[in-house]
Amino acid sequence: MEKHREVVIKFRKDSFMISFGDSSGLGEIEDYLSWLKDKIAVFPEGFVLVEDDGALIGQLELSIREYEGKDIGYINLYYLVPEKRGNGHGQELHNYANHFFKKHHVHEFHLRVSPTNTSAIRFYRKIGMEEVGPEVDGKVIRMKGYL
């Protein structure tokens, strides 16, 4: 991860800018990097940097966690650089996530999205996800999908 430290920071900050209009909600960068390192140790194949023609264009963060007494897949981050959105790369990320969740024997997956990120919500609905409801005082919407 050290090799791509600046890239993962840039991608994560941009995801916050898109979702919330600023990146202050990300918190301390070192805390994020420590959290990411811990997740990679448990689910190494759940952290993916996406490459296209030799350039890093996206990031995917996946894990398995408990929700309401059952194990579910969780998408912490679907990210593509702006110029690569809307041309099939999102579906490729989704296909990878589905494979990861099947490998871990979960049939349901969740994510949370800012209600202002209408492009992301539209994509999530397109791939069959549905809204569960608002969380964190309405700052995010939990969505779920099934394999």
What are these model-derived regions, one by one?
Residues 49, 55-64, 74, 79:
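Conserved beta-strand in the GNAT
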Residues 71-82, 112, 141:
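Conserved acetyl-CoA binding element of GNAT-fold acetyltransferases
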Residues 13-37:
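Conserved GNAT-fold acetyl-CoA-binding loop/helix
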Residues 81-83, 87, 115-116:
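Active-site acidic-Proline motif in GNAT/NAT acetyltransferases
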Residues 11, 107-121, 125-147:
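C-terminal "cap" of GNAT-fold acetyltransferases
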Residues 84, 88-96:
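Conserved acetyl-CoA pyrophosphate-binding loop and the N-cap/start of the following alpha-helix
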Residues 37-48, 74:
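A short helix-loop-beta-strand connector motif used in the catalytic cores of GNAT acetyltransferases and
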